[in-house]
């Protein structure tokens, strides 16, 4: 094997976790000046799901829908458009959004080059326990002292007749115009977010969910509040149903979905599959490396330090299946590099009290245990919950109202806050600071002992009784 084909650290996948780990490794290895080499293998644009077809472009579209809601609220605040209707142009924001993503791709490439990280263009697969072959059986082979698998995941598409008539969340970002009507199939945060954006921008939106509720792993207060708000806002729901087939209508322009009960739903212009994601482990040559996968979902099995069962092979991010969140992949990747290349042998990412946000309408912020999880873990007698629900002051002069609801889940006599769940305008920003408090072990008294900022929604979290 040529010395140019051997690396100290070789990363498979230039997504958020892979790049973060590679750059942190470069920081330490480059400083040592021992000639250590770092490489990263990627077949497409750098940035992974988050930058290209996930968090970043999604947030741009959420911002777009937020502006639309502000326009709707403007007359209540005395703004007169002179009888003119404000028009929304989807191609304009799509062009601006796509250009922004390309700039980010360029920044990632530039940062990799600055850190002397070798970019290997192509699709990498294991050809042995510590060997990666790029671009097929006749492709170049690379070895490394340490290999990181950070190849991410992809949307799931059900195996039903006509499945190709639907698109995934990836395809959402390829839409050239706003569909007049959309059917979103799924009950997770991706389904909820896309349905909210499309409805706010003017697409007649229906959600199909297998059970009575969506966001079922979230606290009951959150999904109950959101379901009512989305229903009040005009989103339609088909519950306790799944899609058995898709077909074109008679004119070929719209799509008709048939449920498992044999009910044909009204035709729509667009169907989005948002039923979950699977790890990209099926075409990585995992068997040739002897890497173990989880039995149920095929994620890469790792220990608390992100090690696989093969010495010198590690994994982070969505491909591990533990919190499919960009900040988690970044944090785990950086800690891995600190452990491998900076002597911090005990450093690891702690998968507890990870805060998360759903960019729904209104947004959700949550950290810690749900009420039911807390009761299951500690017993009903040891849990006390504090709740509040109110109309944000922003809606005081509007006919349209959006409710804000908050819950604190507290443990024991000292009332340690082990869960904090909020939904309402601004909750996507509010949650970060309170997540720090929960991570530090704050109690209800710590919140009570904090002077409120008035008038805000956040003050309710420090004034609950």
From Swiss-Prot:
It catalyses: 2 glutathione + NADP(+) = glutathione disulfide + NADPH + H(+). The keyword GTP-binding does not apply. GO terms for molecular function: flavin adenine dinucleotide binding; glutathione binding; glutathione-disulfide reductase (NADPH) activity; NADP binding. PROSITE patterns: PYRIDINE_REDOX_1. Its main location: cytoplasm. Disulfide bonds join 50-55. The active site is at 454 (proton acceptor). Keywords: Cytoplasm, Disulfide bond, FAD, Flavoprotein, NADP, Oxidoreductase, Redox-active center. NADP(+) binds at residues 187, 190, 193, 210, 216, 276, 324, 357. FAD binds at residues 16-17, 42, 49-50, 58, 124, 318, 326, 454. It is found in: Cytoplasm. Signal peptide: none annotated. Belongs to the class-I pyridine nucleotide-disulfide oxidoreductase family. The active site is a redox-active disulfide bond. Catalyzes the reduction of glutathione disulfide (GSSG) to reduced glutathione (GSH). Constitutes the major mechanism to maintain a high GSH:GSSG ratio in the cytosol. The amount of GSH may affect the determination of cell fate. This is Glutathione reductase. The gene is gsr.
């Amino acid at each position: 094997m040529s010395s140019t084909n051997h690396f100290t650290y070789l990363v498979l996948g230039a997504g958020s976790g892979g790049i973060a780990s590679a750059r942190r490794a470069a920081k330490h290895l480059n400083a040592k000046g021992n000639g250590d080499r770092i490489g990263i293998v990627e077949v497409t644009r750098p940035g992974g799901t988050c930058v290209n077809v996930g968090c970043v472009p999604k947030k741009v579209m959420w911002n777009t829908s937020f502006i639309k809601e502000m326009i709707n609220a403007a007359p209540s605040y005395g703004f007169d458009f002179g009888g003119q209707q404000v028009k929304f142009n989807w191609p304009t924001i799509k062009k601006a959004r796509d250009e922004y993503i390309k700039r980010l791709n360029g920044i990632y490439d530039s940062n990799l080059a600055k850190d002397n990280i070798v970019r290997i263009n192509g699709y990498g697969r294991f050809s042995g326990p510590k060997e990666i072959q790029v671009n097929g059986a006749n492709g170049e082979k690379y070895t490394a002292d340490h290999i990181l698998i950070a190849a991410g995941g992809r949307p799931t598409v059900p195996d039903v007749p006509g499945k190709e008539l639907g698109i995934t969340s990836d395809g959402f970002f390829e839409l050239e115009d706003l569909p007049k009507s959309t059917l979103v199939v799924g009950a997770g945060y991706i389904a909820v977010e896309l349905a909210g954006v499309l409805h706010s921008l003017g697409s007649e939106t229906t959600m199909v969910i297998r059970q009575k509720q969506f966001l079922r792993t979230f606290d009951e207060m959150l999904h109950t509040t959101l379901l009512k708000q989305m229903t009040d806002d005009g989103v339609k729901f088909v519950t306790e149903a799944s899609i058995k087939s898709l077909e074109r209508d008679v004119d070929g322009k719209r799509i008709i979905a048939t449920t498992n009960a044999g009910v044909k739903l009204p035709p729509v212009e667009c169907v989005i599959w948002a039923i979950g994601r699977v790890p990209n482990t099926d075409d990585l040559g995992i068997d040739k490396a002897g890497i173990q996968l989880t039995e149920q979902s095929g994620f890469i099995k790792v220990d608390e330090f992100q090690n696989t069962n093969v010495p010198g092979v590690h994994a982070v991010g969505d491909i591990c299946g533990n919190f499919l969140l960009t900040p988690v992949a970044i944090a785990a990747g950086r800690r891995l590099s600190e452990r491998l290349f900076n002597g911090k042998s005990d450093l690891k990412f702690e998968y507890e009290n990870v805060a998360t946000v759903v960019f729904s309408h209104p947004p959700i912020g949550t950290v810690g245990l749900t009420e039911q999880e807390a009761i299951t873990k500690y017993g009903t007698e040891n849990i006390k919950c504090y709740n509040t629900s109110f109309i944000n002051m922003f809606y005081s002069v509007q006919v349209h109202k959006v409710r804000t609801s908050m819950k604190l889940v507290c443990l024991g006599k000292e009332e340690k806050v082990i869960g904090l769940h909020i939904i309402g305008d601004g909750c996507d920003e509010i949650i970060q600071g309170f997540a720090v408090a929960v991570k530090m072990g704050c109690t209800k008294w710590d919140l009570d002992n904090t002077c409120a900022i008035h008038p805000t929604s956040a003050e309710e979290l420090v004034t609950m009784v």
